[in-house]
């Protein structure tokens, strides 16, 4: 029902969407999972052509990818280092027959950005700095990882083709190379739209 509503561009409340998740994942939604209104705006910007391959950098419980796949004709890929979250995301996609989404259990530094057309980033590495609301205890926070992962993403984005699109939410912009230009903002400046210009 939720995904049919998203396909028909009917508003869906985050609280209703989050009911798809187990309780311990649902409790993290406010802090860690992209709100539907943000996911829809970002997905529409990123999936500018049918079958555009959009990578969610640090997909968490897969909410951005699931909403984007239901709302656009893009192909969404979510990379996540926690196997448990990847499993939950895949289960929801399978149960609701969402075929234009794929979840990858991997670390971001094992992913080549050249396989994708556009990118979404919701401050995935920040839990290595702010430990006040950890997702779980399977990944130990490490301040150096924040900088290492940000540098990796920056380097990968810098070698993408001119015209590549990027959307960031709650980002400190540490991962944005100077070759990208800010083309728009929404949500009081928290959601930013970028395009590679050089």
Where are these regions (language model features)?
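Conserved SAM-binding loop of SAM-dependent methyltransferases across substrates and taxa
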Residues: 63-73
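Conserved SAM-binding motif I beta-strand of class I
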Residues: 75-80
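Conserved SAM-binding loop
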Residues: 89
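S-adenosyl-L-methionine
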Residues: 1-49
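C-terminal substrate-binding/active-site "lid" region of AdoMet-derived donor-dependent transferases
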Residues: 128-198
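Conserved class I S-adenosyl-L-methionine
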Residues: 51-60
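Conserved SAM-binding strand-loop segment of SAM-dependent methyltransferases
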Residues: 98-106
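Short conserved loop adjoining the S-adenosyl-L-methionine
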Residues: 110-114
């Amino acid at each position: 029902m939720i995904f049919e509503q998203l396909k028909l561009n009917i508003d869906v409340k985050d609280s209703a969407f989050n009911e798809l998740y187990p309780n311990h994942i649902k409790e993290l939604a406010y802090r860690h999972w992209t709100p539907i209104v943000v996911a829809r705006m970002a997905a529409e910007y990123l999936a500018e052509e049918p079958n555009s391959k959009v990578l969610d950098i640090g997909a968490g419980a897969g909410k951005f990818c699931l909403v984007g796949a239901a709302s656009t004709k893009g192909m969404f890929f979510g990379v996540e280092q926690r196997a448990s979250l990847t499993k939950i995301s895949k289960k929801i996609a399978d149960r609701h027959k969402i075929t234009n989404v794929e979840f990858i259990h991997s670390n971001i530094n094992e992913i080549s950005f050249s396989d994708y057309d556009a990118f979404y980033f919701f401050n995935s590495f920040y839990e290595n700095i702010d430990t006040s609301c950890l997702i779980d205890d399977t990944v130990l926070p490490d301040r150096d990882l924040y900088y290492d992962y940000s540098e990796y993403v920056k380097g990968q984005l810098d070698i993408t083709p001119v015209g590549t699109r990027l959307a960031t939410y709650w980002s400190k912009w540490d991962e944005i190379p100077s070759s990208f230009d800010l083309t728009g903002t929404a949500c009081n400046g928290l959601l930013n739209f970028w395009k590679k210009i050089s």
